[in-house]
Amino acid sequence: MSDIIREAVTQLQSKIGTFDGSVKFVIEDEGSIILDEEGAREGDGDADCTMSADAETFRGILSGDVNATAAFMSGKLAVDGDMGTAMKLGAALS
């Protein structure tokens, strides 16, 4: 597991814990994370929603320095799947 993935899993666990639904985060050139009712973990399974971004954007979203909606609107964050799940996660991260 890369340091970026490890750090992101730790931050998601402390910030959100568990999540009603499933989201996969794909961090370019690093790997992917699943967040669901079991918590956050490294993984590459099916999810209701998939969010893809580079490591810098993902770190900024987790730290609160980057607004997820603004990242999506500017093309730095790609979302595929259930937009309702993505919006629910965005609210949980803010």
Predicted regions and their residues:
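Feature captures hydrophobic
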Residues: 1-94
